[in-house]
Amino acid sequence: MAHQFAELMFTQSVKAAQEQYGSRARLEHFTAMAGPNDELTEREAGFIAERDTFYMATVNEDGWPYVQHRGGPPGFLKVLGPKSLAYADFRGNAQLVSVGNVSSNDRVSLILMDYPNRRRLKILGHMRVESSGTDLPEYVAKVERTVYIDVVAFDWNCPQYITQRYTESEFALR
């Protein structure tokens, strides 16, 4: 368990639940031994570059969470630096729920999955949206917005209960 991630996620209510269900002492031990995990390393950058999908959560001004799936070619989510991610946002269904949500609360949570290898990376950050085109020139399609995420913390999650799933190309390699 990453120290910075636990600092942000383990609120008093969460700690009370951990205490009630008997996991608090174990999690305190893991957190105390862990590094801060507030800067992406080559390990995270490589994992992110291989992903062709992720899930992103935002919260609206009424406190309702919204989870969105984002997909593209492998590597469409770019690591710009040890604390910075970006992706090109193309025209979709025009609901703009996530874009609207971050105008009042810029906090965002991402989950990136590697189903075949049962790996999961959770990222917390602050999101900003720029409509003025893109500085991600490798995209040929019209980019409506560029989404930037300032990474605050991340955590690698245990593989337990991750159901293995394969794309056709991944299955062919087995």
Model feature map: region roles:
Residues M1-R174:
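Binding-site signature for planar aromatic cofactors or substrates
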